[in-house]
Swiss-Prot record:
Pfam families given in the database record: GATase, GMP_synt_C, NAD_synthase
Name of the protein in question: GMP synthase [glutamine-hydrolyzing]
Species this chain originates from: Streptococcus uberis (strain ATCC BAA-854 / 0140J)
Gene name in the database record: guaA
Glutamine amidotransferase type-1 domain boundaries: 12-205
One cellular-component annotation, GO: cytosol
Pathway: Purine metabolism; GMP biosynthesis; GMP from XMP (L-Gln route): step 1/1
Length: 520
């Protein structure tokens, strides 16, 4: 099976993973410049990099100290490949340590820096072309470079960091102590663009049309004349996968829509009408509501919920596949963010993802995950490129476990109904207010908390519903949406008046991080 990163005619910049939970944002930013980019293990060898043939290499940040016994290293031959290298934070310290410089705890060189700092450019550099000599950057480091290797020179510093940017112009090796991939580094995108376009010589011609052509070729090569099953949830990811697979293999694709009793209001009928009718996908609808809810009865641990749903979902596929002939592959709408949030060898698992960590070991299918190198906004872009209508492409994201992870604690029919009805009201009012494109994701959660209220002349003791609405670009970081008060008031009033067993509404004003988008 041909991986995109191995295709010789595709320019790519690889990012070596040293453990920062958000280092995949580096790859995302580089893709914005029309250059394919993805993470690779820091254990990659120089020979493996030669085979990939990238035009640039980025060494990411990470939590380790380069002088520690268990520090993540690098194949020293990588520095002799003649490929431009950019080290970010830990990556800069690793370059320094490996090439003969010195790295010490920051207290010995200045001070630790966490947050925005002013970077002062002291020497002209291609990396900082067309950016100001003083600029705000995000620092997050407990170690500092005190001596730079031979052949390197100082490019920039800050009040507490004597070497905030260094370079070896002859070998095209650059190091920066700050994080250009986050928005708090005001000119971070310009710096990464300078590296990709002007230093690495990228053409900037990577597009979704390229992705479609390559994925179709890859799918056909992998599948051959065999059959594929796809689980449809009605969400953006599985819908885009369905259209892409149909384009690649036509009637070799059978879609299974598992109605597990955890869907949004009227979602089952909408899925069948939208994808089965308009796009002509071959869809088998399975009513598995009782099967799922019986297994979930009394389960309040979110990880157990995810595992149960992931396992049972595949077992339902097994049951349906046994009725078909020659089915060898299971397709999923796994995204790049799903894989990262489920943990890599260098990063801690935040939560097992329904498309990654919930699969049983005895699964009978081989997996196909056509979107697993894409971020959410890229999936929407892909949908448009495939000719899908905007109302489908911009459909609200919905997790594989469905409402199970939007009901805190044990699941009951009563709790599910409160979320279904309140979520429908929220989506309706957001659309009426013309905010459905401005707010990246929005949904309601049954918090499992009951509180005292008064309705009419009587005392109530009913559920508290939380509204979660966020703004984001790629789903890796997010801010809570500052919805107009009149819109929030209308939503709240409608929910408590129209939804049974609810008497209180709260608004979640937590960003990501520290919170995740979903509550469970």
């Amino acid at each position: 099976m041909t991986e995109i990163s191995m295709l010789k005619d595709v320019q790519k910049i690889i990012v070596l993973d040293y453990g920062s939970q958000y280092n995949q944002l580096i790859a995302r930013r580089i893709r914005e410049f029309g250059v394919f980019s993805e993470l690779k293990s820091h254990k990659i060898t120089a020979q493996e990099i030669r085979e990939i043939n990238p035009i640039g290499i980025v060494l990411s940040g990470g939590p380790n100290s380069v002088y520690a016994d268990n520090a993540f290293g690098i194949d020293p031959e990588i520095f002799e490949l003649g490929i431009p290298i950019l080290g970010i934070c830990y990556g800069m310290q690793l370059i320094t340590d490996q090439l003969g410089g010195k790295v010490v705890p920051a207290g010995q060189a200045g001070n630790r820096e966490y947050g925005q700092s002013t970077l002062n450019i002291r020497t002209a550099s291609k990396l900082f072309a067309d950016t100001p000599d003083e600029q705000l950057v995000l620092m997050s480091h407990g170690d500092a470079v005190t001596e730079i290797p031979d052949g390197f020179h100082l490019v920039g510093d800050s009040n507490d960091c004597p070497y905030a940017a260094i370079e070896n112009s002859e070998k095209h090796i650059y190091g920066i102590q700050f994080h250009p991939e986050v928005r708090h580094s005001v000119y971070g995108n310009d710096i990464l663009r300078n590296f990709a376009i002007f230093i690495c010589g990228a053409r900037g011609d990577w597009s979704m049309d390229n992705f479609i052509d390559m994925q179709i070729e890859k799918i056909r090569e992998t599948v051959g004349d065999k059959k594929v099953l796809l689980g449809l949830s009605g969400g953006v990811d599985s819908s885009v996968v369905g259209v892409l697979l149909q384009k690649a293999i036509g009637d070799q694709l059978t879609c299974i829509f598992v109605d597990h009793g955890l869907l949004r209001k009227d979602e089952g009928d909408q899925v069948m009408g939208m994808l089965g009718g308009k796009f002509g996908l071959n869809i088998i609808r399975v009513d598995a509501k009782d099967r799922f809810l019986e297994l979930l009865a009394g389960v309040d641990d979110p990880e157990k919920k995810r595992k149960i749903i992931g396992n049972e979902f595949v077992y339902v596929f097994d049951d349906e596949a046994s009725k078909l002939k020659g089915v060898d592959f299971l397709a999923q709408g796994t995204l790049y963010t799903d894989i990262i949030e489920s943990g890599t060898e260098t990063a801690q698992t935040i939560k097992s993802h329904h498309n990654v960590g919930g699969l049983p070991e005895d699964m009978q299918f081989q997996l196909i995950e056509p979107l697993n190198t894409l971020f959410k906004d890229e999936v929407r872009e892909l949908g448009i490129a495939l000719g899908m209508p905007e109302n489908i492409v911009w459909r609200q994201p919905f997790p594989g476990p469905g409402l199970a992870i939007r009901v805190m604690g044990a699941i009951t029919e009563e709790k599910l109904e409160t979320v279904r009805e309140s979520d429908a009201i929220l989506r309706e009012e957001i659309a009426k207010a013309g905010l459905d494109r401005d707010v990246w994701q929005y949904f309601t959660v049954n918090t499992g908390v009951r509180s005292v209220g008064v309705m009419g002349d009587g005392r109530t003791y009913d559920y508290t519903i939380a509204i979660r609405a966020i703004t984001s670009i790629d789903g890796m970081t997010a801010d809570f949406a500052q919805l107009p008060w009149d819109v929030l008031k209308k939503i709240s009033t409608r929910i408590v008046n129209e939804v049974d067993h609810v008497n209180r509404i709260v608004y979640d004003i937590t960003s990501k991080p520290p919170a995740t988008v979903e509550w469970e």
